[in-house]
Amino acid sequence: MRLLWGLIWASSFFTLSLQKPRLLLFSPSVVHLGVPLSVGVQLQDVPRGQVVKGSVFLRNPSRNNVPCSPKVDFTLSSERDFALLSLQVPLKDAKSCGLHQLLRGPEVQLVAHSPWLKDSLSRTTNIQGINLLFSSRRGHLFLQTDQPIYNPGQRVRYRVFALDQKMRPSTDTITVMVENSHGLRVRKKEVYMPSSIFQDDFVIPDISEPGTWKISARFSDGLESNSSTQFEVKKYVLPNFEVKITPGKPYILTVPGHLDEMQLDIQARYIYGKPVQGVAYVRFGLLDEDGKKTFFRGLESQTKLVNGQSHISLSKAEFQDALEKLNMGITDLQGLRLYVAAAIIESPGGEMEEAELTSWYFVSSPFSLDLSKTKRHLVPGAPFLLQALVREMSGSPASGIPVKVSATVSSPGSVPEVQDIQQNTDGSGQVSIPIIIPQTISELQLSVSAGSPHPAIARLTVAAPPSGGPGFLSIERPDSRPPRVGDTLNLNLRAVGSGATFSHYYYMILSRGQIVFMNREPKRTLTSVSVFVDHHLAPSFYFVAFYYHGDHPVANSLRVDVQAGACEGKLELSVDGAKQYRNGESVKLHLETDSLALVALGALDTALYAAGSKSHKPLNMGKVFEAMNSYDLGCGPGGGDSALQVFQAAGLAFSDGDQWTLSRKRLSCPKEKTTRKKRNVNFQKAINEKLGQYASPTAKRCCQDGVTRLPMMRSCEQRAARVQQPDCREPFLSCCQFAESLRKKSRDKGQAGLQRALEILQEEDLIDEDDIPVRSFFPENWLWRVETVDRFQILTLWLPDSLTTWEIHGLSLSKTKGLCVATPVQLRVFREFHLHLRLPMSVRRFEQLELRPVLYNYLDKNLTVSVHVSPVEGLCLAGGGGLAQQVLVPAGSARPVAFSVVPTAATAVSLKVVARGSFEFPVGDAVSKVLQIEKEGAIHREELVYELNPLDHRGRTLEIPGNSDPNMIPDGDFNSYVRVTASDPLDTLGSEGALSPGGVASLLRLPRGCGEQTMIYLAPTLAASRYLDKTEQWSTLPPETKDHAVDLIQKGYMRIQQFRKADGSYAAWLSRGSSTWLTAFVLKVLSLAQEQVGGSPEKLQETSNWLLSQQQADGSFQDLSPVIHRSMQGGLVGNDETVALTAFVTIALHHGLAVFQDEGAEPLKQRVEASISKASSFLGEKASAGLLGAHAAAITAYALTLTKAPADLRGVAHNNLMAMAQETGDNLYWGSVTGSQSNAVSPTPAPRNPSDPMPQAPALWIETTAYALLHLLLHEGKAEMADQAAAWLTRQGSFQGGFRSTQDTVIALDALSAYWIASHTTEERGLNVTLSSTGRNGFKSHALQLNNRQIRGLEEELQFSLGSKINVKVGGNSKGTLKVLRTYNVLDMKNTTCQDLQIEVTVKGHVEYTMEANEDYEDYEYDELPAKDDPDAPLQPVTPLQLFEGRRNRRRREAPKVVEEQESRVHYTVCIWRNGKVGLSGMAIADVTLLSGFHALRADLEKLTSLSDRYVSHFETEGPHVLLYFDSVPTSRECVGFEAVQEVPVGLVQPASATLYDYYNPERRCSVFYGAPSKSRLLATLCSAEVCQCAEGKCPRQRRALERGLQDEDGYRMKFACYYPRVEYGFQVKVLREDSRAAFRLFETKITQVLHFTKDVKAAANQMRNFLVRASCRLRLEPGKEYLIMGLDGATYDLEGHPQYLLDSNSWIEEMPSERLCRSTRQRAACAQLNDFLQEYGTQGCQV
């Protein structure tokens, strides 16, 4: 052996003497665009005195003659034999050398150029190079949002911070993009960042589905410099308290015989930190690797919270029993998790919050063992360092844990040697164990175990490097602990095994992808190197050392992690010393930095963390260091079997002319291949077995849908008949029937009670109400601002009114110190005594509302407080308001207190509840919230449009009649609103029309939930922008209008992307098949919007490509999932629909050609052009046949003209269209034609008088005429026929903008904008209009002077009494438009609207099957409550447990109060059907206004839309409205159901309205009223005597026949009639019948004698008159009896045109005595007095 080593030493010495000079070239293996590249050059083995000069630069490997960077010179010598250079990589040079055009991969070549290479080394060239990976990634971008979670429709505010590679502010241009939860880009913005901080915001579309959205940013010239942040979108309400589940141990051991009792603690605390009083409902289950839950039956528990906490124990026996029911044992649980769900119901207010624990693992050891920091390479003859990290299952480091190592060393020809070592972990859970390694080693096998008696075990095998090499380099680290910034790290270098005689070690330090330091150290017996660790080396670095032995480099490396806890600079946030604050107080926020910096602040309610997912965390320094470390090019802990491997693993590229590292292929490190064994646990439970019978995911989902219950009664056969896919129907039906057989028929319901303080006492020694601040401002976040701070600044902040914990975040950006994220500061805002108040969304006049504020007392003493509701006009309150209730609130508890309130005015009132303590205990709180009060009945709208033409003498005077709808509620005080304009283009497309704050969408009064409807946000705005651009009229509108237009277009683009599918197509709903028609519509509009939305042309090219796949052989297009059924469009059914669709797609494809700008898309563009030509031939053929209806003829003519089809085809289409034109006056339009099968409209209106209102046409006529106008403009320009068609279209616009529905509005505005561009003139014209009317308040007159270029005073909105006629006089030389809008509430609707459609809504009290309907199929498996005869059944079965899992998706706090839960829930049934002879456009919408105080259960609505047997296409909830979308209305009655919960008690609930209408023809509708269940407490009286008396103050008082005492007052009837209130009518009537009308009772009577009249000139004996009284009044007139009624004239009329009378406090109602009664001696005088009054008043009236 000695001889062998001697020979090796001799040969090495001989080799050393032959070492040749060489140039070494080092660089990071990746070049980042625009970032300086560190390059190391070194001379090796050159003769003494040698000087070498040269330069380094980058070049394109394929284009050697053009450099990609400037050249950097170097000079090396034998004394100064190395240099570290910096090479700039400018963007302009990278482009000029063609790097961006490389096809084979993004590589760039680093080149060293020196004549010495050729002259002294006899090389063939003076170039030495190495290939590097080229990346456009550079710098750092950090993003921040103002909240982690948002509701759909909420505004997102965000910031982007830009830094360069050295973490200093960057001012480059960035591109920001927003992606929705489907991964589709919905927003793109390019911005310049002069301050390095960019702030912006956007609104999430209200139709967005729940999911995770992403905002990403990149430097605009660096496509790979992408950074992003995520946030959650879902419907939520901020929780009032948070629930946490904490297991006793973070793991559950599954070792046989060692299963312990499972302990867990449940904690519930209000967001402001105080404990919750209430009850906890807990259930358990299993979670598998895929997250699927299986619930344990029988382990449910109910416990009371004590001081906000509850302790739960699950015994070994209970758990094993539950496992046995699943046919499982303890050993089957390895790798699974125990799932725990807890629902807490707060006692005082009945609010519910939930939490779940999903990280409680079943494990074989309580520890985990991590060997990732141990090298995978060893140095023979040098110690091998084993580095292990031991963690507890919670993830925290495990200190003091024994780690045992068994190291087996294998050497050739000898017996393996085993070393056993034991060492305890340090405070950070780590151990570093050196293992002695002999020089002859071939393999090292390590077996490591941590902990006892159930250790975590890991194994590692390390092979020795190949023998026969040039020796080895060992890097030894005396102190293995991670250094901190500012420490000095000592490393020892040793050459092992070669006997090499070199003079120096060379070493480099690499951090964040750059060589930051290069040096050499003379060789000694033990060479020590000291490394000072500064901020540039954080959070980790590689130390790489090497030497040369002969012609071979010998190298090793070591990765060093740095404890980089703080940022380079400094940012500290602090507040004044108080631990607790009160709302409305000022707080001084201290900002401290160590340099001039911009500090970005934000404060958010920590309740948001409880509302959302825990995964969306705010930006912190950990994320910053993670981003910095992402530039680290090294992979692994260091080392390698060869020098080239060492360099590559450290992220270095190397070349010495003879050998070099291979070019890197990707930025990231290769991932270790890990395999996970899928567990196949057989639960053998009924439902799981059933699911297991189906292999395909589709069949499984259908089966799962089948076992899920609906919130309404349906047999499985009925449900299966609705499933559209045949292959889904069988598993759905089978699983539905199977689940039905498993369900139990009854469940127990538990109730709990609350106490109320009802005693009303007078105010005594109370503190002044003015001293109590009113709380009314409750934001979710605030303080979103950026401050400039020079080392120190104090901000004075005023705290909002929320009682919560605020978290203030700060982030600083300094030119000298870079980015720093401060530790957040928490501010707890709290009042020891406070109240909490909930209000319903809205109530109606004279309904009775029970307010139930909850008083919280966290003081250590009992409090007696006085609580009252402040007086406010429009509300009836006890004592007129201000009368207080005195309530005792014990220390540390809460008490609810009830107030009855009756609203009497239809308005929004600010309702303030005040609680006051005494001077002895001066506590108090006041909360103000707005209560929305609406009128009775349902809103009805009607519009009139008049053309103003002073040039036609017949139209210079108009008379607009007043409205006298017999259904109008009697005391609504309604008005007619008049709007006059002299500029139709600016009126329709300006800042009050298409560019109004909500766009046309907000003006249509239609829902916008489906894919087609949402385009109303985008298309009209584009038409308006196009008109204003072309006519240069932006300046006539408010300055911000154009910015607003761009914002509207961006919002529309974001909305429509919610409906895009991966193949580029669009669907009305994502769950439906793609629609050809909708996809074409989107393509057309987005092609026109490309510039504004910054959308991807490639995405629209995909859309065009999908449309081509829908074209048939004859050139037509098919639509397998139509959005609208257009069979009603006129002409031949079916044929017309195909023709219209083909024309529509052809138009879209033509507009879509604009996105084919790049050369690569040319083949697809040619295919599109060929498709258009083929479709045009089809259309021409159909037009030539002459059988098309008006709509198909119009769109065909336009398509052929737009695409420049052959002239003969265009001519035929034009002639066909003009043959169908219809005239009315000077207007031209296209509607129904003779022989049309359309049932949509009435016959053509006859020519009219100019002073008559313009007949309002249906949506289809408007759309047809718009297409005709578009055709005429292309065919003949602005000519007479185009003028006439445009004039007709203009007069069809609604009062507030838009037309009837979405499609007609989009096409009409498109056509009118094109016409107005063509007809624009700068000539000024004037219009003079005088309006006059005599109304309730006398004569009223307005004179208007308008011109056609005005914007100020462009639209004058005037109000006139609804029943009064309006006289109009017109003058001037300009045409204009006058529109009248009448809005009023009606008593009844069905008689006038329900011709073709029918809707019926019924509400019932809670029924048994609806309870079960809220459960998943999992509940049926394992969670059925024990039956009554079960001996183990709990004494009080728990209702919330039955609701638990089924409501996981409902909005928070949807749980009703525990008190009287059954009574506060109702079941809605909505039934729709239609007349079988009537055709519909397809989509219909049921708009159900819920009864006051109710909201629908979202989980129920989701079941109607999300299962395979879909009943409703989509649903929306807006305030008290539930909108249900139906694809069609059946001819037979079809019903759907859902539950609703009343959060706030309301009594005397009035009927609410429901409307069913055809979306695309809204005039076709049915509106009805429905009421609360009969004998329901919803109809009971809630008010106290005094409040009831106030509410009835406006009610009439019935005078009983010959009331006692009144006869003593002479002439009391005459005084009422003639003095106060002085009546306007007096009748003696006989009551015939009573009828209910909305919130009123109607009495139909026959006049028997007329005593007096004012307005009712036709009143006579035997005529009929109607009298109305509010349903909330107690007055009842008995049919068959006669009454004397006197009062004031009414404002409404019956169907015959006769006045109707409202009976109120100004009415006299007296029952007429019978003849028998008058004959009695006692009443004779009184009867005579009554007859004398009737005689005198009837003949002489009032003598005053």
Curated annotation (Swiss-Prot):
Disulfide bonds join 68-97, 635-669, 702-728, 703-735, 716-736, 1471-1535, 1583-1588, 1595-1673, 1618-1742, 1718-1727. SMART domains: A2M (SM01360), A2M_N_2 (SM01359), A2M_recep (SM01361), ANATO (SM00104), C345C (SM00643), Thiol-ester_cl (SM01419). Its main location: secreted. It is found in: Secreted; Synapse; Cell projection, Axon; Cell projection, Dendrite. The record marks 1125 as: Responsible for effective binding to form amide bonds with immune aggregates or protein antigens. Complement component C4 is expressed at highest levels in the liver, at moderate levels in the adrenal cortex, adrenal medulla, thyroid gland, and the kidney, and at lowest levels in the heart, ovary, small intestine, thymus, pancreas and spleen. The extra-hepatic sites of expression may be important for the local protection and inflammatory response. Changing residue 1207 to V: In allotype C4B5-Rg1. Glycans are attached at residues 226, 862, 1328, 1391. Prior to secretion, the single-chain precursor is enzymatically cleaved by plasminogen (PLG) to yield non-identical chains alpha, beta and gamma. During activation of the complement systems, the alpha chain is cleaved into C4a and C4b by different proteases depending on the complement pathway: C4b stays linked to the beta and gamma chains, while C4a is released in the plasma. The alpha chain is cleaved by C1S to generate C4a and C4b following activation by the classical complement system. N- and O-glycosylated. O-glycosylated with a core 1 or possibly core 8 glycan. The keyword Secreted applies. Keywords: Blood group antigen, Cell projection, Cleavage on pair of basic residues, Complement pathway, Disulfide bond, Glycoprotein, Immunity, Inflammatory response, Innate immunity, Phosphoprotein, Secreted, Signal, Sulfation, Synapse, Systemic lupus erythematosus, Thioester bond. Residues 702-736 form the Anaphylatoxin-like domain. One of its GO terms (cellular component) is symbiont cell surface. The modification Sulfotyrosine is found at residues 1417, 1420, 1422. It is linked to Systemic lupus erythematosus: A chronic, relapsing, inflammatory, and often febrile multisystemic disorder of connective tissue, characterized principally by involvement of the skin, joints, kidneys and serosal membranes. It is of unknown etiology, but is thought to represent a failure of the regulatory mechanisms of the autoimmune system. The disease is marked by a wide range of system dysfunctions, an elevated erythrocyte sedimentation rate, and the formation of LE cells in the blood or bone marrow. This is Complement C4-B. It comes from Homo sapiens. The lineage of its organism: Eukaryota, Metazoa, Chordata, Craniata, Vertebrata.
